[in-house]
Amino acid sequence: MACLTDLVNLNLSDTTEKIIAEYIWIGGSGMDLRSKARTLPGPVTDPSKLPKWNYDGSSTGQAPGEDSEVILYPQAIFKDPFRRGNNILVMCDCYTPAGEPIPTNKRYSAAKIFSSPEVAAEEPWYGIEQEYTLLQKDTNWPLGWPIGGFPGPQGPYYCGIGAEKSFGRDIVDAHYKACLYAGINISGINGEVMPGQWEFQVGPSVGISSGDQVWVARYILERITEIAGVVVTFDPKPIPGDWNGAGAHTNYSTESMRKEGGYEVIKAAIEKLKLRHKEHIAAYGEGNERRLTGRHETADINTFSWGVANRGASVAVGQTEQNGKGYFEDRRPASNMDPYVVTSMIAETTIVWKP
């Protein structure tokens, strides 16, 4: 007799050409991912060949009840690591029935920036270091922490191994492999400084695809933690006190920065970021003031700074200085930042904006 797991793992390709497409979108809070599935007559690899769909925006905080229809536009396709076969995950953005982007659709304006000739010519690359914290479902307390208590001080947990130092590795490894299967350019994972906190990296990715990949990687992580009965939080400072917060350091380069003499281009770009520090901070994630305190490997939120290999700076430059070209790392974005907003804003400030 078949058990539930057997049915969940049924291979549809043996009996039908039809596939399941899971449409994913961002809800009204700007961080809540939503999804629903539909049957399609056969495999699809081009998002422009996928049908648009709709949903009840009044149930996601994105439309009033008397005019609640929101339209999903498919934008990027990934292989589905949960259903496998020819089934797909579809990253969408959201529009009114008249075709106008709704206010929470940050992808639309990001895509306009990335498709502008000036930005496209520079082919901006991104590597995003997404930190997150795993919480016990019933207590909302970090995984591996004693209920109502605290583990030993930070030090042994970063990239640590062992049952007393590493909590949730099965979830992390499942997520790593699922992202690779899906076609996300996930480039690594590691345990973080605070116990129960982890990081995965996505990139290098070009332009708008960086945001698509980070959002779908987040979606896959939330689905895996759902299966595991664990809660994932992207809060930038989940535990107050002498514990590291969670960020989404954004590594960035342009064609000009990657060429000989690129270090001068990088320094000019950093100067532009300094001039627009307040605007960037306002767009870099909610609650970031709890994280950017000048302690725990962060810069103070009110002061812009940069340096070579300086983990306490707003922007860090590594081997780039010695090589004379390369990339830099914007360390200000919080773990709950919108990658569409952050990536496009960095490109706009450093390539398009004139002081």
From Swiss-Prot:
**Compartments, record wording:** Cytoplasm
Task: Report the EC code(s) recorded for this entry.
Answer: 6.3.1.2
User: What reactions does this protein catalyze?
Assistant: L-glutamate + NH4(+) + ATP = L-glutamine + ADP + phosphate + H(+)
What GO cellular component entries does it have? cytoplasm
- Disordered: annotated span: 37-66
Q: What Pfam families does the entry give? A: Gln-synt_C, Gln-synt_N
Where, by tissue, is this protein expressed?
A: Found in all the tissues examined with higher expression found in tissues of the root, stem and seedling shoot.
State the UniProt keywords alphabetically: ATP-binding, Cytoplasm, Ligase, Nucleotide-binding
Ranges where the GS beta-grasp domain occurs: 19-99
Which molecular-function annotation in GO is an example for this chain?
A: ATP binding
Q: Does the keyword Transmembrane apply?
A: no
The protein's matches in PANTHER family, at most eight in alphabetical order, are given as: GLUTAMINE SYNTHETASE (PTHR20852), GLUTAMINE SYNTHETASE CYTOSOLIC ISOZYME 1-1 (PTHR20852:SF93)
Protein family: Belongs to the glutamine synthetase family.
Q: What does this protein do?
A: Plays a role in the flow of nitrogen into nitrogenous organic compounds.
Name this protein carries in UniProt? Glutamine synthetase root isozyme 4
Provide the species name.
Zea mays
User: In the record, what lineage is assigned to the organism producing the protein?
Assistant: Eukaryota, Viridiplantae, Streptophyta, Embryophyta, Tracheophyta
